[in-house]
């Protein structure tokens, strides 16, 4: 095997913003609610329904960007990422890519970032995980599968995306 290549590993980490309403409509976010009880024409993608930005999500994202040393964009834009999945009622996802809200920045790693029961201690002085961007997007609905059937819970459609465990990130290092 040639030694001319250097492995480059990138991570895409999703964080769920704790907001009272969905990303682009006023439907409440209540996890564990009865399926399909928190939906509206906007999050179901019905004709004529227009999205309205969740101001709370915008503020939380800007605050996060400032805490992580990102450049906060003067102008950002949202795109419709088109694809078809049964749990995407609009056949597109509202997301950001080339003009995100936050650019650059980084997450400083410290010894305290590792759980006390970690198997080995890793010196992390001056180590920073560099960020490319922080952007906002909505989540898709939740598919569930039973023994003889499947269903879709649209309560989650249009919410900020679900979080992934911070521990899973620490395990990579």
Which role fits each region the language model picked out?
Residues 1-173:
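Basic, nucleic-acid-interacting segments
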